[in-house]
Amino acid sequence: MKKTALYLLAALALTGCKKTQATADGDAAQQSTEQAGATQADAEKLLTPEQIAQQWAKGGAVSVKGGGEKPDIVTLVSAFNKAWPTDVTTTLLESAKDPKFTEYVNEDTGGGMACDRGNGYVSVSAGDTDEDCMEAAVWKRKNGHRLFIINLVSTNPDNRSLPEKQALCIYDYDPKTETMTPEENAVSKFRASADDLKLMYRLPRKGTDLTIGEANEEREDALWHFFEWNGSQFSEAIAYTEKELTKKIEGSWMCKDSDEPMLTFNIVADDANGPQIEDCAIYGSTEYDAFVYTWDGTLIISENGDSGEDRNPAIYCQFRLTKQDELTGTYYLRQNGGNETKGTITLKRGNPAW
């Protein structure tokens, strides 16, 4: 029973009212039932990411009372949660009531929460559970508005690295009206390149650029697309493209031994089923040889057989670009039995490979 109720009972006793213990217990039971009913009613109002995805487009604007000119990320998430209440955002906001709260990590599950007000970012991760998760971030616009994005995800119990269902909600916040209005942009319009690929959104905690990955159950390594922020809007997705070599390296070369990748990149590997999304890195290893063909911009990593044996290609790579116009990677090679040589590969943006 609440303290106020206890104080009231004490006052009634002092004034001679005959409030029996049985009656008090009955009141407590009734109050407990009412609280349980209220909790159940609140739970019934909570929406799943799938429900929000189905209804959000028709939801309209969201009021942000007291948002002012510089609303922080918690204020915007709170306004969203009033219009579209979910368990995961409610949980985050409960912790965010403490202005000093920044992070929580569940050591048992690997999940947790982050509340970075300074960088305009919050998240809830599921770890190795099947709970829902979310990310939200805010961007400053040159016209004084804010771009607010929140992504709510239902975890796939069979593959936690891929979303089961998700709701990506994007708003423009107007400080004059203290209102968030749904917005379409390059991110919301982006579609997967194949029907069996799912999209994975990654909002930035630091920096301003956003990434979207494509992956499926068979191939978990995502092909990432980058969206650059220009202060007002996102660019169209930057295509991954074929590479050009800045230095011609001929012959058979072996990578220098290394525990860290010397160059990482996405590739498209052709097999009997057509183009396949691959994620690749050049690691230093004595078990593989690197063959570089400069005339068509391809690289073959092959198994390292005994001296004099033919080597069958293990991976046939066509480099694809990350977000930069130009990306240069340096790695060290040594010819079989020879001296170590430094090689450089530069990737440049061109026409999409497919």
Regions found by a protein language model. Give the residues of each.
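C-terminal motif of bacterial Sec signal peptides marking the signal peptidase cleavage site
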Residues: 15-16
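Mid-length scaffold segments of soluble, non-membrane domains
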Residues: 142-185
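Short aromatic loop motif centered on NTY/YTY
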Residues: 179-243, 290-292, 301-320
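Terminal domain-start segments
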Residues: 24-140
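Edge beta-strand at a domain terminus
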Residues: 226-227, 231-235, 240-245, 288, ...
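N-terminal helix-cap/turn-to-beta initiation motif at the start of protein domains
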Residues: 240-254, 266-272, 322, 351-354
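N-terminal glycine/threonine-rich, aromatic-flanked beta-hairpin/loop signature
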Residues: 259-297
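Structural signature of eukaryotic scaffold interfaces centered on beta-propeller domains
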Residues: 135-143, 200-206
